[in-house]
């Protein structure tokens, strides 16, 4: 039987793991917004004829942002089909709130939050496995 200290340490580790994966999943929307900002800046400068290719406002990050978005999408797609996978897709890829995603999936808000937390727990193991395979 595990002691109280060991149980607390395991719980803290799981919480940290879930926070890491949550930050990783949230990066999808940030990268999408950065790409959108990049397109807007490019369009604005081309239209005003002040565009200089050497002085891009956000130079060099596009490849990274696209790769990061692809990583997030592939992590979610690697999950088994089910409510958890759909919840993560609607919330992190499509940018819907948890409440609206639950509505779209046909269950209550409370169930939506439960499914979301279960999904984060499940995907955190996939994320950690991928991270360890890269090292």
Features from the language model and the residues they span:
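DNA-recognition helix of helix-turn-helix
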Residues: 106-126
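Short amphipathic alpha helix immediately N-terminal
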Residues: 79-96
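N-terminal interaction/assembly modules
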Residues: 1-78, 99-100, 124-135
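Secondary-structure boundary/capping signal
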Residues: 83-84, 109, 131
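Helix-turn-helix DNA-binding module
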Residues: 94-110
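Short, conserved sequence motifs enriched in acidic/basic residues, glycine, and aromatics
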Residues: 78-79, 106
